């Protein structure tokens, strides 16, 4: 099984869970939850500015 990492928060995604989103230009994003998907695609937030992500910088 291939291990995947959430494109937004940086946490591991268990096999059989999560969602794969493919843009028209061919870029692929993996999301562990609807929360991550909505924050990235709809709200256009930066993971570096949210404390609950692994990419958070102080």
UniProtKB/Swiss-Prot annotation:
Biological process (GO), any one: translation
Cofactor: Zn(2+)
Keywords: Metal-binding, Ribonucleoprotein, Ribosomal protein, RNA-binding, rRNA-binding, Zinc, Zinc-finger
Pfam families xrefs: Ribosomal_L24e
GO CC terms of this entry: ribonucleoprotein complex; ribosome
Zinc finger region(s), C4-type: 6-36
Cofactor, free-text remark: Binds 1 zinc ion per subunit.
SUPFAM superfamilies: Glucocorticoid receptor-like (DNA-binding domain) (SSF57716)
A molecular function GO annotation: structural constituent of ribosome
Binding site for Zn(2+): 6, 9, 32, 36
Sequence similarity: Belongs to the eukaryotic ribosomal protein eL24 family.
Functional summary from the UniProt entry: Binds to the 23S rRNA.
Assembly notes: Part of the 50S ribosomal subunit. Forms a cluster with proteins L3 and L14.
Record-given protein name: Large ribosomal subunit protein eL24
Source taxonomy: Archaea, Methanobacteriati, Methanobacteriota, Archaeoglobi, Archaeoglobales
């Amino acid at each position: 099984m291939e291990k995947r990492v959430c494109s937004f928060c940086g946490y591991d995604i268990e096999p059989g869970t999560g969602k794969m989103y493919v843009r028209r230009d061919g870029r692929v994003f993996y999301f562990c939850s609807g929360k991550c998907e909505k924050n990235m695609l709809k709200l256009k937030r930066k993971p570096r500015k949210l404390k609950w992500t692994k990419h958070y910088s102080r």
